[in-house]
C-alpha cells in the first residue's frame, strides 16, 4: 500500500467512525424521548379526566380534554396506530427502548472495530515513517 493509499484509507475510517458516532447519538436521543414518553404515559394514567393544552406544532397549542387516560395509541409501524391499555403500551415502549439500545451497542462496537483498524494502520504507517496530515476543521 502506498503512503497516499494509507492516508486515504485512514481518512475513510475516520469518516466512518464519525458517521457511526452520529448514529449512536441520534439513537440516544430517541431512547431519551421514549423514556420521557413512558413517564408521561404513567403520569397521565393516574388522571381520570383533565383539561389540557395540546401542542399542534410551531409552539402553538389548542385546548383539549383528556377523556380516557387508561388507553393510549401506540405506533405499530407503517403509520398504523394500535390502541393499548397503559401497561401494555409501556411494555411496548420499553421493548422499543431495548431494541434501540441493542442497535446503539452494535453501532458503537463497529466504531470501535474501525478505530482498531485505524490504530493498526497508523502503526504500520509510523513504521514506514509516513507523516499523516492532520484533518483541518
Residue ranges and their predicted role:
Residues 1-76, 80-137:
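Intrinsically disordered, low-complexity regulatory regions in eukaryotic proteins
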